[in-house]
């Protein structure tokens, strides 16, 4: 214990974390388990907050959310129900989000990091379901991670549906949580964005003369975002298209 404390005191946090880990693995009966995990949690949190990893334990060099997630994962693995474990599991997700929002060599890599974040947050909601406050926090964070991932216009917009579903689950399971209003606002914002996309598709179909297809998407717009400018445009278009569609049907031609 003295070696780990000395390393931490002089700022060699990475080695200190490893020494604390060795104590828990090799001498679990001879140390205060909760105290050691608390020290590890504080060290990992410093790295999560932006502290740099050091070269030779002395020269601050780089930040690494991958190494930070591994630290928090070690805490959870060895003490899944310790006092710091739920927050450590949350911080695994936060570290993946930070990594996703940093420089990435490809979109696929960024989306993979968001998926890791969702998995970490979802584990909070599942593993600690008997602690509503932390479980609610995990579910809300999972929804937010899905939402961030959906902001990439080139990515599968099915992720938006997953975000909406997760926020909806949060509202249904934790109706008294303070963030319910925020969840509703995020759902509304995402549906408006979906409506904008559907309106573009509807206009494309209409321009190509595929009136039935355009009508389907205009109806989708009005259902997704009632009361918005998008819905008003869609309702006007539906009214304009209906006589044309009726005329095509009466003539025996199947509208596209």
What are these regions (language model features)?
Residues 1-256:
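Acidic, polar-rich low-complexity tracts and alpha-helical solenoid repeat scaffolds
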């Amino acid at each position: 214990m003295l070696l780990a404390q000395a390393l931490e005191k002089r700022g060699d946090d990475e080695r200190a974390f490893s020494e604390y880990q060795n104590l828990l693995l090799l001498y679990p009966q001879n140390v205060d388990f909760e105290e050691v995990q608390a020290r590890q949690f504080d060290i990992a949190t410093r790295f999560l907050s932006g502290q740099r990893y050091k070269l030779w334990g002395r020269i601050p060099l780089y930040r690494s959310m991958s190494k930070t997630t591994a630290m928090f994962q070690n805490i959870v693995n060895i003490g899944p129900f310790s006092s710091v474990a739920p927050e450590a599991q949350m911080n695994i997700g936060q570290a993946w989000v930070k990594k996703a929002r940093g420089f990435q060599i490809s979109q696929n890599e960024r989306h993979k990091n968001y998926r890791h974040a969702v998995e970490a947050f979802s584990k909070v909601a599942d593993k600690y379901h008997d602690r509503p406050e932390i479980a609610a926090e995990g579910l809300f964070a999972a929804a937010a991670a899905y939402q961030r991932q959906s902001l990439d216009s080139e990515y599968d917009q099915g992720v938006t549906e997953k975000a909406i579903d997760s926020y909806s689950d949060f509202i249904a399971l934790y109706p008294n949580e303070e963030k319910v209003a925020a969840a509703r606002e995020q759902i509304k914002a995402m549906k408006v964005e979906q409506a904008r996309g559907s309106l573009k598709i509807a206009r494309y179909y209409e321009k190509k003369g595929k009136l039935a297809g355009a009508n389907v998407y205009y109806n989708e717009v009005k259902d997704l975002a009632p009361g918005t400018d998008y819905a008003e445009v869609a309702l006007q278009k539906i009214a304009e298209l209906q006589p044309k569609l009726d005329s095509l049907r009466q003539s025996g031609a199947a509208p596209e």
